[in-house]
């Protein structure tokens, strides 16, 4: 990513958190956090990584709600960020948090087994 794409991604992350948290009223969208935004070098595509609190069903419902509101989110983003063209938004789950939790669980299990022996 170029320096400009990185700056645009950080600004989008901040604005998306505000838009999703305050402007969207869809009951399908649960408690979520925008963890990262990666913008392509030409500023045409933005991958938005989200973390959702809840089970797999809640995550899927949240993704459906975000897909339905994608046009509204993009227009709000266009009003807040000065770009010639607002990037196309793609929402994806941030698997790194689940991966980190899994590693932490494994370490705790290893430590518990070590103390028992």
UniProtKB/Swiss-Prot annotation:
<keyword id="KW-0963">Cytoplasm</keyword>
<protein>
    <recommendedName>
        <fullName>Ribosome-binding factor A</fullName>
    </recommendedName>
</protein>
<dbReference type="GO" id="GO:0030490">
    <property type="term" value="P:maturation of SSU-rRNA"/>
</dbReference>
<dbReference type="GO" id="GO:0005829">
    <property type="term" value="C:cytosol"/>
</dbReference>
<dbReference type="InterPro" id="IPR000238">
    <property type="entry name" value="RbfA"/>
</dbReference>
<comment type="function">
    <text>One of several proteins that assist in the late maturation steps of the functional core of the 30S ribosomal subunit. Associates with free 30S ribosomal subunits (but not with 30S subunits that are part of 70S ribosomes or polysomes). Required for efficient processing of 16S rRNA. May interact with the 5'-terminal helix region of 16S rRNA.</text>
</comment>
<comment type="subunit">
    <text>Monomer. Binds 30S ribosomal subunits, but not 50S ribosomal subunits or 70S ribosomes.</text>
</comment>
<dbReference type="GO" id="GO:0043024">
    <property type="term" value="F:ribosomal small subunit binding"/>
</dbReference>
<keyword id="KW-0690">Ribosome biogenesis</keyword>
<dbReference type="Pfam" id="PF02033">
    <property type="entry name" value="RBFA"/>
</dbReference>
<dbReference type="InterPro" id="IPR020053">
    <property type="entry name" value="Ribosome-bd_factorA_CS"/>
</dbReference>
<dbReference type="InterPro" id="IPR023799">
    <property type="entry name" value="RbfA_dom_sf"/>
</dbReference>
<comment type="similarity">
    <text>Belongs to the RbfA family.</text>
</comment>
<dbReference type="InterPro" id="IPR015946">
    <property type="entry name" value="KH_dom-like_a/b"/>
</dbReference>
